[in-house]
Structures are given as structure tokens and as C-alpha cells.
Amino acid sequence: MPRYGYTTGTCATAATRAAIIALATGRKLKSVEVKLPSKKNAIININDVEIKEDYAMASVVKDGGDDPDVTTGLVIYSKVSFTDSGIYVDGGEGIGRVTKEGLPVKPGNAAINPVPMRMIKNTAMETLSELNISSGLKIIISAPGGDKVALKTCNPKLGIIGGISILGTTGIVVPYSAASWRASIVLAMRVAIKSNYDTVILTTGSRTEEYARKLFNDRYPCIDVGDFIGFSIRRAAENGIKNIIIACMPGKASKLAMGMEDTSSRNSGVDFDFIYKMALSINIKNAEIIKNSNTVNALVDEFTDDGLFKLMAELAKINLRRISNINIDVIIFDMSGNVIS
């Protein structure tokens, strides 16, 4: 059974509750109970609590469970101090700042998404009420080292600079969740539209993104969609994107040429018999070589000049245009970044 984890939003909320209790009572709790957006409760372990004369700070170690979350292991801090009234929440060290339109958070604000922001504020108000305290609070969420971790996320592409985002719609991290990736794709498209782009490049990995950026000299925004090609095309059309350039490697291109929308190896491997029949359809010599190949990349040197990959790209375009009437082009790169289609 996979082990679930908790979002950065849940961690920040728990740290906030522990810090308020510490500031008000002097108690340093080892764990706190917080209410998740699902209305369920979760008990979160507290890493550390520090109490000073005019503030208290508590921390929670981010645990993403079995999900390969780059924020796992980060320490999320909440520093709280009393004010005259209201609940003010901002980001400190390691929390990103939004610089572009199209995200749930307005430019200039800390990258604390709406659901975790509500969690933090609601928990703060409930905790004050439990303690019979009528003053306000200033709450600063931080994550030392978040600036470096953020470079491994899509934050820089989304225009979130300087740190991680405080995220979570359910409060729980589902292991190996594809939902978070799909959500980031949609966000990136909205940012592109808000930035007045009507053309985006959908890449199937970090290498194709690097090659596409170099080829187009960063003229269009690149979005790493992984295997979610069909999903991304539909969302692009819904969000007003007019033109899509698919940048991929030969293996994934062959799957698109077959009519697949999800190119994950979990769903299907490369069909070399299909590629062989493609080669026969354009009278390629030595097509028998394809039957004994282990990878599509191994065919590049032998068949690029024979038009095999140009046909592959054309078939991929025909299939992908059936998903939406959006204008679609397909570019295939070899392992060295050369365009072979």
C-alpha cells in the first residue's frame, strides 16, 4: 500500500497552529491536529518550536510519502507575532514570488495558493478562538533552501521566482500523482496566454525542451508535458492557444504516429512492426533492419535521409489534429538535438 504524504500547505498550516499555541501559552507541542480541505483531520508532527519575547516559530518537515516530490525533506517554518487585528500572511525565505498573470495568486504576492492560504488563515482564527485571544496575527511562512529546490520544479517557467510554492487542494499528497503534473500544464498555458502568446511548444522531456529552446531561440514558451500529449492539446485549445509545436524524440513520435495520445511506456512499447510498415509504404531499402532493432533511436542514422521520420511526423500531425482543430506541427529531434523530421 503506497504511503500518502502531506502538502506544503498542510505543513505550513500545522506549523502555524503550533507557533500560535507556543506564543500564547509557552507550550512546545510535539504534534498538532489540523483540518484538511476534505474536512478530515490530520495529526502532523512538529519538528521544532522556538519562543521569543515578541514572536514564536514552529516548523514541520515536509513529507511527501511515497511521491517523488522534490520538496520532501524541506523544513517549512511559520513565524507568528500578535498584531492589533486581522490575519496577515506572507512568504519569507525560500517561498517564491509570483511575477506573471494567469496564476491563482496575483503578481507581487507570495506563492501561497488560495486553498492553503485559507487553511492557514482559518486555522489561525480557530486557534485564537480556542485560546480566547482577540488580537490579530502576522504570519510569515518560510522554507530555507526553497530557492534551490524550486529550480527543480516548474516555478521558474511559471514566473514564480526565489522559492517554492505553498500548494495543495486536498492537503494530502497522492503518491506518483499525475494530477499535479496535469495541473501544472494547465497553469503554464494560462500564463502563456496572459503573457500574450498564442503559440506554445509542448515538449516530452527535459532534453527536447532544451533542444526546442535552442532551435526557436526562446521565441515561444516551452511546456514539459511528459506523456500527456492528448490532454495537453485539449487544454491548450480550451485556454485559447492557437498554435502548438510538439517537440519529441523518435520513440514517442512513433507512438503519436500510431494514434496514441498518452506515450507512456507503461501503456505501450514501441511497435517496430508499425515502423517497418511505414518504411515499406515509402519504398525504403533495408527496411528489414527495423524488425531487429531494439530502439527507435538506433534507426536514426540509417533512415533519416530516406524520409522515415518525416513520414512519422506527418502521421503524428494527422492523428493529433483529430483531437482538436488547433494548428499543430511536430518536430522530431535525435539524441544530439538535430531536427530529423
Swiss-Prot record:
GO molecular function, one term: cobalt-precorrin-5B C1-methyltransferase activity
Keyword Signal appears in the UniProt entry: no
E.C. designation(s): 2.1.1.195
Associated pathway: Cofactor biosynthesis; adenosylcobalamin biosynthesis; cob(II)yrinate a,c-diamide from sirohydrochlorin (anaerobic route): step 6/10
Keywords: Cobalamin biosynthesis, Methyltransferase, S-adenosyl-L-methionine, Transferase
Protein name: Cobalt-precorrin-5B C(1)-methyltransferase
A Pfam family annotated for this UniProt entry: CbiD
Catalysis performed (reactions): Co-precorrin-5B + S-adenosyl-L-methionine = Co-precorrin-6A + S-adenosyl-L-homocysteine
One BP term from GO: methylation
DNA-binding in keyword set: no
The family this protein is said to belong to: Belongs to the CbiD family.
Organism: Picrophilus torridus (strain ATCC 700027 / DSM 9790 / JCM 10055 / NBRC 100828 / KAW 2/3)
